[in-house]
């Protein structure tokens, strides 16, 4: 029994790849530095647009967690394509959008974690941990709890 528990802890500390797609270089660097400083076992990469992600994926790089902002996305089909190519990738929506309809749409596309850019560091790290350890779990920043009824239907 103890072996099972220790192996579970070890697997949650395995080096995983986090990709951040953020067009605002300053915000992207802040998020990247936050994760690197507090979760040094995670490998963090920063890109400016989602078009670049496909060359990484086709280059056989596993992307375990993807932070993105739908505002910077010109085509939501990219998210569906990312999930089709790599269904195990956990998607974290990190945005200023608080609209329930946007959250509902993203959830239907396979996004399970939602933070705002105003979220404090602890919330962002908690969302990262959930995506890392429980990839199919739903995580909502408390500022987005009004969206929860839409996602439970």
Annotated model-derived regions:
Residues 22:
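Conserved acidic carboxylate
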Residues 25-47:
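Two-component/phosphorelay signaling modules centered on CheY-like receiver
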Residues 76-88:
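Short amphipathic alpha-helix used as the core "switch/output" element in two-component signaling
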Residues 135-153:
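CheY-like receiver
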Residues 88-100:
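A short, hydrophobic beta-strand element within the central beta-sheet of small alpha/beta folds
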Residues 48-65:
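Acidic, metal-coordinating helix/loop segments flanking the phosphotransfer/catalytic sites
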Residues 101, 119-128:
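C-terminal output helix
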